[in-house]
Regions:
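Active-site signature of cysteine proteases
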Residues: 1-157
């Protein structure tokens, strides 16, 4: 799926995208979607000590502040399937992926045109991290020419 999305954008096609925006990792006011890594065992020293003293509610608030780039989860097909099977991921919104962007920490994002009209802070555009798109995508629709050749061949297109 991600190969199709990336190939479409690399070849000047947009992607119609069905996703789940009822997630904690999606902020309408900040116009961003992320999947923060909650298992921060790689922390050391004072960071680990400070994190260890936070309550569960405080940890969640820190993860979803949306104030700076942070570490995100590595998404697997098993995670996607489990989220679908237990109804954690549902198809509740459609948008159009227009392009890509990179944040100040070098993390990849997709620039997405929302159907809610022109709204701040980015005039109706939102930025979804690569892990968010990999995790919460329900469907994509692309021009068949946007599909990578090996996949097109397997599909008989």
């Amino acid at each position: 799926m991600m190969a199709v999305v990336d190939n479409a954008l690399a070849n000047d096609y947009t992607v119609l995208w069905g996703t789940d925006v009822s997630e904690k990792g999606f902020s309408r006011t900040k116009a961003i979607g992320i999947v923060p890594e909650a298992d921060l065992t790689s922390m050391s020293g004072t960071d680990a000590e400070r994190w260890g003293k936070l309550s569960g509610k405080e940890k969640e608030a820190a993860l979803y502040k949306f104030d700076k780039p942070g570490k995100e989860r590595v998404i697997t097909q098993q995670m996607r399937q489990e989220a679908f099977d237990n109804y954690e991921t549902t198809d509740d919104h459609g948008m159009q992926i227009m392009g890509t962007a990179v944040d100040q920490a070098g993390n990849d994002y997709y620039k997405v045109k929302n159907s809610w009209g022109v709204r701040p802070p980015y005039d109706g555009y939102y930025y979804f991290s690569r892990p968010f798109v990999a995790y919460k995508t329900m469907s994509v629709m692309v021009n068949k020419k946007a599909i990578p050749a090996p996949i097109r061949k397997k599909m008989g297109l």
